[in-house]
Design a protein with these regions (language model features):
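Conserved catalytic or regulatory cores that recognize and/or transform ribose-phosphate-containing ligands
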Residues: 17-192
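Bacterial N-terminal signal peptides that target proteins for export
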Residues: 1-13
Length: 192
């Protein structure tokens, strides 16, 4: 039979160990949801939608770079860039995979706390322009349209008219997105 002093010391050590484990910082890491994966349900973490230039895979994969820049944040990244995109899919409502993509993007945009729109130079991105227009009044957009984007003037005028936050560089975009996600986390996802 163990002595009461030894048992007390063991319990005390166990309490200290438990407190240390509880106090250890959790490793933050984003959950990345790529279309057409299902959107998470009842996930309280802030969500960011990475909208903008894809050009059916022809634009640089800026979404991957921004996702890496968020790698230390406990957020959900909603990425519409599909690695399995098939150029043979007709852009029509009766094309099942095309419809699935559009419906996924619409749902992801609605569920996002922060919406990024990056309009890469040399691209046209008409669907991203449409999505920007749909969400210009929502207060969730952060937009980067550098010189060389096909309709930079339209983006600039619309952003000014509706108070959309614009940035000038990818570094500024990253900083603005990180701050907006931190603000969303502080407010609480379902507080809006």
């Amino acid at each position: 039979m163990k002595s009461p002093a030894l048992l007390s010391a063991l319990l005390s050590s166990l309490a200290v160990l438990t407190a240390c484990i509880a106090a250890a910082p959790a490793t933050a890491q984003p959950t990345v949801v790529i279309s057409p994966q299902p959107l998470p349900i009842d996930d309280a973490r802030p969500r960011v939608f990475l909208g903008g230039s894809i050009d059916m895979g022809g634009a640089p994969d800026w979404q991957a770079a921004l996702t890496r820049a968020l790698s230390d944040m406990d957020v959900t990244v909603l990425n519409p860039r599909r690695p399995d995109w098939n150029l043979a899919w007709r852009p029509e409502a009766d094309e099942p995979e095309f419809r699935r993509q559009v419906e996924w993007e619409l749902a992801a945009l609605e569920s996002a706390d922060v919406i990024v729109m990056y309009f890469a130079p040399g691209t046209q991105s008409p669907i991203s322009l449409l999505e920007m227009g749909l969400h210009a009044r929502g207060g969730k957009l952060i937009v980067l349209a550098p010189e060389g984007f096909w309709r930079k003037g339209n983006v600039d005028i619309t952003a000014r008219a509706y108070g959309v936050r614009q940035v000038q560089t990818m570094d500024e975009l990253t900083a603005a997105v990180r701050q907006a996600l931190a603000d969303a986390a502080e407010k609480g996802r379902f507080a809006r």
